[in-house]
Design a protein with these regions (language model features):
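Conserved beta-strand signature within the Rossmann-like core of class I S-adenosyl-L-methionine
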Residues: 136-144
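Class I SAM-dependent methyltransferase SAM/SAH-binding core
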Residues: 56-101
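A short glycine-rich, Lys/Arg-flanked "PGG" loop and its adjoining helix->strand segment in the class I
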Residues: 125-137
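Conserved class I S-adenosyl-L-methionine
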Residues: 1-42, 44-54
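Short catalytic micro-motifs in class I SAM-dependent methyltransferases
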Residues: 116-117
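A conserved beta-strand element that flanks and buttresses the S-adenosyl-L-methionine
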Residues: 113
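C-terminal alpha-helical "lid/dimerization" subdomain adjacent to the S-adenosyl-L-methionine
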Residues: 144-220
C-alpha cells in the first residue's frame, strides 16, 4: 500500500471525527484564516479557491464573513466531502479535485489558498505552481515550518543540515527511505516547511508577506513552527 492509499484510508476511517481532531477556534490555522479574512477587502478579492478543503471549514467561514464572495473548495477524499455536505455545503461549493492538477484556467480565481495541506503532499511544489497559475491576484498558504519546530538544539541541527542542502537525504534516513511519517493525529505527513517553496512564490509575486501563527522570535525561519504566507501577484493601486 502506498502513502496515497494510506492517507485515503486514514481520512475514511476518521472522517466522522475529523472536525473534532483538526478544527479548533484557537489553533494556528484559524489564526491564519482570520488574517486572510481581514485581507479580502484590502485586496478586493471576489473569488477564492480553497485547495484541500477537508470538511469545508475555510469555505464556511469565508461565506459567513463575506456572503457575496465566490468560494469553491476542492477535496479528493469523498468521505470528507460528505461530512461537508452534511454541514450545509453544496456539491457545487465543495468538489472533487487534485491540487497537483487544478482543472481551471489561469487567473480563474482572485486568490487561491491552502490550509494545512502541503505537508501531506510528496511534491508540494507542484501544487504551489498550480495555485500560482490559477490565482489572478494572490495566493495564501498556512502550513508547517519544520525547521522552526522542536528545541533550540533540534532546530539548529535541522537548519545546519538544510544549509548544506542535505535535508532530503537526512529525512530519507530518518524515515527509513519512505520520506514520510504516519501518525494517528495527522495521517501521512512529509517533513515540510513553507520556506521550501519560498523562491518559487517569490518569483511569481510582486510582494510576499510572512506571518508566524504560533509564538516565535524575530527570525521566522529559525523559530516559527508554523507560518502563514501571502503572495500578492498584483494589487489595485487604490484598493480602498
Amino acid at each position: 500500500m502506498n502513502e496515497i492509499e494510506i492517507q485515503q484510508q486514514y481520512y475514511e476511517r476518521t472522517a466522522a471525527q475529523y472536525d473534532d481532531m483538526h478544527l479548533h477556534r484557537d489553533d494556528e490555522q484559524y489564526f491564519a484564516l482570520s488574517y486572510l479574512i481581514g485581507m479580502i477587502e484590502f485586496l478586493q478579492i471576489k473569488s477564492i479557491l480553497d485547495v484541500g478543503s477537508g470538511t469545508g471549514r475555510v469555505i464556511r467561514d469565508l461565506k459567513r464573513s463575506h456572503p457575496h464572495l465566490r468560494v469553491l473548495g476542492i477535496e479528493p477524499v469523498k468521505a470528507l466531502r460528505d461530512i461537508g455536505y452534511s454541514q450545509g455545503l453544496t456539491s457545487s461549493e465543495l468538489v472533487a479535485g487534485d491540487g497537483n492538477s487544478l482543472q481551471y484556467q489561469p487567473g480563474d480565481f482572485d486568490l487561491v489558498c491552502a490550509f494545512g495541506v502541503l505537508h501531506h503532499i510528496r511534491n508540494p511544489e507542484l501544487t504551489v505552481a498550480e495555485m500560482l497559475r490559477v490565482a489572478g491576484k494572490a495566493i495564501f498558504i498556512s502550513d508547517a515550518n519544520n525547521f522552526g519546530q522542536g528545541s533550540r538544539l533540534s532546530r539548529t541541527v535541522k537548519q545546519t543540515i538544510n544549509f548544506f542542502r542535505l535535508w532530503p537525504l537526512a529525512n530519507l534516513i530518518k524515515t527509513r527511505g519512505k520520506g514520510y511519517a504516519v501518525t494517528e493525529g495527522d495521517g501521512v505527513a512529509y517533513s515540510y516547511s513553507v520556506f521550501m517553496n519560498y523562491s518559487l512564490i517569490r518569483a511569481a509575486c510582486k510582494s510576499l508577506h510572512l506571518l508566524n501563527t504560533l509564538d516565535a522570535g524575530a527570525n521566522l525561519y529559525r523559530t516559527a513552527p508554523h507560518i502563514a504566507l501571502l503572495g500578492i501577484k498584483k494589487r489595485l493601486s487604490n484598493p480602498l
